[in-house]
């Protein structure tokens, strides 16, 4: 039983793009970024993805969302990319002429991209809000609570007084002593003096 024939419990819509001029391996690299995400998130990710395969994949996801809205009457805000995969299409074989009468084979690979979107209702209000938004709210609340406590401690502590500056005497930095040379070895000195033993 394949993913396309498997019955789902949520209403869904399908879109396919066949004979897309991108290799399946490169298409799968982009597809893995959006599997399981909402349609709006998936399209945002693909809009900024630098891979060339992101264009055709985004087009198929948008088509599946339009199919769900027009044919199934589903709410586009609840659509999730449930299943997405790229199968290998036919490979066109071409020849690249090379030096000395040789010819190299070029394989122009194609893909069949399939997208299934499902209308999944939001679980609750908490899950609808992104985790990033929850973290920022929590940090703002913590900073408000934390900001009042250090202010009280600072007010209780007396400020430290600085030592008065000396009158007119300018300090100069201390000079470093020159490095000492290591003493010469005894065997080297006897050889240098001409002692041959």
Swiss-Prot record:
Residues 172-183 have a biased composition (Basic residues). GO terms for biological process: translation. The keyword Ribosomal protein applies. Disulfide bonds: none annotated. It holds the Pfam family Ribosomal_L22. Residues 118-197 are annotated as: Disordered. NCBIfam families: rplV_bact. Part of the 50S ribosomal subunit. This is Large ribosomal subunit protein uL22. It comes from Mycobacterium tuberculosis (strain ATCC 25177 / H37Ra).
